[in-house]
Amino acid sequence: MTMLKDPSKKYRAFPTIDLPDRTWPSKTIDAVPIWCSSDLRDGNQSLIEPMDAAKKLRFWKTLVSVGVKEIEASFPSASQTDFDFVRTLIEDGHIPDDTTIQVLTQAREDLIARTFESLRGAKKAIVHLYNATCPSFRRIVFNQDKAGVKEIAVNAAKLFVKYAAQQPETQWTFQYSPETFSATELEFAKEVCDAVIEVWNPTPENKVILNLPATVEVATPNIYADQIEWFGRNITRRDSVLISLHTHNDRGTGVAATELGLMAGADRVEGCLFGNGERTGNVDLVTVALNLYTQGINPGLDFSDIDGVRKVVEECNQIPVHPRHPYVGDLVHTAFSGSHQDAIRKGFTQQKEGELWEVPYLPIDPADIGRSYEAVIRVNSQSGKGGIAYLLEQEYGISLPRRMQIEFSQVVQGETDRLGLEMTAEQIHSLLRREYLQANVPYALISHKLQEENGNSSVDAEVHVDGETQHWRGKGKGALEALVAGLPVAVEIMDYNEHAIGSGTTAKAAAYIELRVNGERAVHGVGIDENITTASFRALFSALNRSLSQTQAKAA
């Protein structure tokens, strides 16, 4: 079977919402939603191998440490394992006073009773009721009409009131999800929710949660936003209701749907860390939270050690996070492209502490989420001078002059082409040493004596040439001019730069020389030494030897 030439014969577009006076497109997200993690329930039930109790507890503690205040811990009536986990959290004191446990149940009395029993002794708890409401589920799965579906929800809501009254020591919050909300007729979804509200009788001080799932993502995010805005306008007792979003990622727009839903007036977001969940996953709470953060809003969730959080999630879920996953993937703060690297390097150079973040290609400062700058720039055959210069400067304190960056990038390019792999900072530094610092043929500087008198310098350089030692002597206005005067070839210095590497008594000097030998093409040399004069002499010999070697290679 192949893709249809006319898919409209098999699939139909989801109808738009009649909301000509919609207001959400002109809104911004300026308030932080209530966050609810469903990792231990929705996320766990989607795993090939569900978490055991130890993994669940480890995950729970991670969610608490991040700052998630509402955590859906399990489906207690589904298994003894889930029931026991809730008991462990309560009896062993794993629920902080500012954190609320949430559990899920279907709309059957035996399951509801078991669910409330699992929560006995909890200081506060959210009990989450659901039943599917959309036409396809009513017809295909349950063989129920609208009245039957509504009756299921209302009867279950009454049972919530009954069993909660038997445990008055717990502060109860009730939550109802018209499952498949986004595929349900809006008027009917409202009708069912209104009926549930009537039973639960919420107040502004004791609100109910109406969770409106895109159980399966069936339309573009703007349609979901229209549904949320319409619902918020029309639901009864809006001041006593928290509207909660629960999006999935079937069409790849779970984050967008959530953000537009918040613009449309929602108060709360359910999801999973890094987007685990049924099929293509629930909305990623991390992405939504850090999207807020990069708009200048503190999301109330702390991902200062995002790699530590990822490690827990990967080990508990046994699913690796994709290297391109927003904010946390191994490659999301990495640039291989030469133009990107150059822009990033310039951005880091100009970025001042305490100023607005404006580094190109990096929407967030990696340091804010515990990432080092080490992996920001990586070098492969597509890389340019900016990335190479950045790595040498960050890792080794070596600041190559601009024209030398261009020259050395060609050396690195040849090496990456030869290897067919990316190069690490260590490999680039090794190549710099081999190409420049160890360029000692045909002339190797062994030692030198420098004398200065009345503004004039004289140099006696001991040089190893073809197996024997020679002394080159010269005079000039400065040390370099004196050394050049003593060379056996005509050398013209085009540019000279120097800087310190490190500080204090252990600091070294780096010197860079650009020169031409006998009128040939200009080349660069590098010298590093504790003494700045020695460093400059080594740089001159480095450039001299490289020039002569290139001339000889060209002649051959």
UniProtKB/Swiss-Prot annotation:
Pfam family for this entry, one: LeuA_dimer
What Gene Ontology terms describe where this protein resides (cellular component)? Answer: cytoplasm
Q: Where is the signal peptide?
A: none
The catalytic activity, as recorded, is: 3-methyl-2-oxobutanoate + acetyl-CoA + H2O = (2S)-2-isopropylmalate + CoA + H(+)
Q: Name one GO biological process term.
A: L-leucine biosynthetic process
Q: In which pathway does it act?
A: Amino-acid biosynthesis; L-leucine biosynthesis; L-leucine from 3-methyl-2-oxobutanoate: step 1/4
Localization per Swiss-Prot or TrEMBL:
Cytoplasm
Enzyme kind, highest EC tier? transferase
- UniProt-recorded Gene Ontology molecular function terms: 2-isopropylmalate synthase activity; acetyl-CoA C-acetyltransferase activity; magnesium ion binding
Name the cofactor(s).
Mg(2+)
Pyruvate carboxyltransferase domain ranges (all copies): 33-307
Q: Where does Mg(2+) bind?
A: D42, H246, H248, N282
Q: What is its EC number?
A: 2.3.3.13
Q: Where is this region: Regulatory domain?
A: 439-556
The UniProt keywords, alphabetically, are: Amino-acid biosynthesis, Branched-chain amino acid biosynthesis, Cytoplasm, Leucine biosynthesis, Magnesium, Metal-binding, Transferase
Please give the function described in this protein's UniProt entry: Catalyzes the condensation of the acetyl group of acetyl-CoA with 3-methyl-2-oxobutanoate (2-ketoisovalerate) to form 3-carboxy-3-hydroxy-4-methylpentanoate (2-isopropylmalate).
Q: Which NCBIfam families match?
A: leuA_yeast (TIGR00970), PRK03739.1 (NF002991)
Of which family is this protein a member? Belongs to the alpha-IPM synthase/homocitrate synthase family. LeuA type 2 subfamily.
How it assembles, according to the record, is: Homodimer.
Name of the molecule in the record: 2-isopropylmalate synthase
Organism of origin is: Pseudomonas syringae pv. syringae (strain B728a)
